[in-house]
UniProtKB/Swiss-Prot annotation:
Residues 2-71 form the RRM domain. The modification Phosphoserine is found at residues 48, 136, 144, 146, 151, 159, 170, 196. Signal peptide: none annotated. It comes from Arabidopsis thaliana (Mouse-ear cress). This is Serine/arginine-rich splicing factor RSZ22A. Residues 139-149 have a biased composition (Low complexity). PROSITE patterns: RRM, ZF_CCHC.
Length: 196
């Protein structure tokens, strides 16, 4: 499989239009049109000879720049196809050089040396975001446990109340002791006088 880079595209160009333009040269496996930023695309030809024919015939047509994009390391995946641009060296594509690797034929967002296509980075950021949401319930759970930790103080509040009851119960026995030995009111007065 051979990947072809197409630059200087009109932002309104669709994948179907590109496929119709290049279909006559051979079997196209996939077509990818950039949207952010627009203006370029990649086509995967099943046969590298078909890709070379397409580059020869279409390069310069409609103002397009058509170059071959080589996979680094001998064809390791779709993301790698966007990383190369060896064919662009001979064409002087200095205005389309990648800021990451210095090669022409692709942008920094599509450079393999940067860690793959931009889509992969977005997927990583999405994968990182769910753990943040997963952590929040744990914090919420800890907060929910804190009221349970505060629940023991109510028994402590109950403990003073029996003491208060003891104090309320204790005075009647003292009064009973004073009143029991002396049935008459005079006896109580005599005791108080004798104590005085």
């Amino acid at each position: 499989m051979s990947r072809v880079y197409v630059g200087n595209l009109d932002p309104r160009v669709t994948e179907r239009e590109l496929e119709d333009e290049f279909r006559s040269f051979g079997v196209i496996r996939s077509v990818w049109v950039a949207r952010r930023p627009p203006g370029y695309a990649f086509l995967d030809f099943e046969d590298s000879r078909d890709a070379r024919d397409a580059i020869r015939e279409v390069d310069g047509k409609n103002g397009w720049r058509v170059e071959q994009s080589h996979n680094r390391g001998g064809g390791g995946g779709r993301g790698g196809g966007r990383g190369g641009g060896d064919g662009g060296r001979g064409r002087g594509g200095s205005d389309l050089k990648c800021y990451e690797c210095g090669e022409s034929g692709h942008f920094a967002r599509e450079c393999r040396s940067r860690g793959g296509s931009g889509g992969r980075r977005r997927s990583r950021s999405r994968s990182r975001s769910p753990p943040r949401y997963r952590k929040s319930p744990t914090y919420g759970g800890r907060r929910s446990y804190s009221p349970r930790a505060r629940s023991p103080p109510p028994p402590r509040r109950r403990s003073p109340s029996p003491r208060g009851r003891n104090y309320s119960r204790s005075p009647p026995p003292y009064r009973a002791r004073d009143e029991v030995p002396y049935a008459n009111g005079n006896g109580l007065k005599d005791v108080r006088r004798s104590r005085s």
